[in-house]
A protein has these predicted regions:
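An acidic-aromatic
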Residues: 48-97, 161-164
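Bacterial N-terminal signal peptides
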Residues: 2-11
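Short, exposed beta-strand/loop patches in secreted or surface proteins that constitute
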Residues: 32, 48-53, 66-67, 111-119
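Flexible, surface-exposed loop/linker segments and immediately adjacent secondary-structure boundaries
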Residues: 89-122
């Protein structure tokens, strides 16, 4: 009878171990992402570009669209239309623009589990699954993290189909990023039409 109970509880014990391992991997990844001098990540996949990150501040450039966020205000510049929108984005809006914010809020916004070790982009690492706690219930975010706790890739699936995928092609820490890099500089875009949505 005791053996039967132990077998019945086994999936819950494994799940608890996976959650502990996921927490360990994600926390160590956040330490890397939170470097006081900032990081630069170049990426490809559904979109190509690069991201500068320092705490919650970021600058994202994917060619046609550039976004600056200084921790309060966001500026989004569209090269095709020469328009810049200014807003105070919600946490959900920020996560859709800057995928690293998903990792920064994993404990509050997601249920998470450790999937296992794997090789991705030629590097050995970990796979962690994130599922939103509310809304977007069919969405699954797969995060691939290297053995040195640097993000390798992120994939968003919904109902068995891939919505987006980002592969990190270069990841550099200790970038000495100045705070001014996270604010739109109108003098560099003199023809831009400013649309203030705040």
């Amino acid at each position: 009878l005791l053996t039967l109970w132990m077998l019945a509880l086994l999936p819950y014990c494994i799940s608890a171990q996976n959650d502990a391992k996921a927490t360990e991997v994600l926390d160590k990844t956040l330490e890397v992402l939170s470097g006081e001098n900032g990081i630069r990540a170049d990426f490809g996949g559904t979109e190509n570009g690069f991201l500068l990150l320092k705490g919650e501040k970021f600058y994202l450039n994917n060619g046609n669209i550039q976004s600056w966020y200084d921790g309060e205000t966001q500026w989004s510049y569209v090269a095709d239309t020469e328009e810049v929108n200014i807003s105070h984005p919600t946490p959900e809006e920020l996560q859709s623009i800057n995928p690293y914010l998903i990792l920064m809020r994993y404990k509050t916004d997601f249920n998470y589990s450790y999937k296992g070790e794997l090789t991705r982009n030629g590097a050995k690492g970990h796979e962690v699954i994130l599922k939103p706690k509310r809304g977007r219930s069919a969405e699954i975010i797969r995060v691939f993290i290297s053995k040195t706790y640097q993000p390798l890739a992120m994939k968003v699936d919904q109902n068995g189909k891939t919505l987006s995928e980002i592969n990190i092609t270069s990841f550099r820490t200790d970038q000495h990023l100045e705070d001014g890099m996270f604010r739109f500089n109108k003098s560099l875009y003199p023809n831009a039409e400013v649309i203030d949505l705040r």
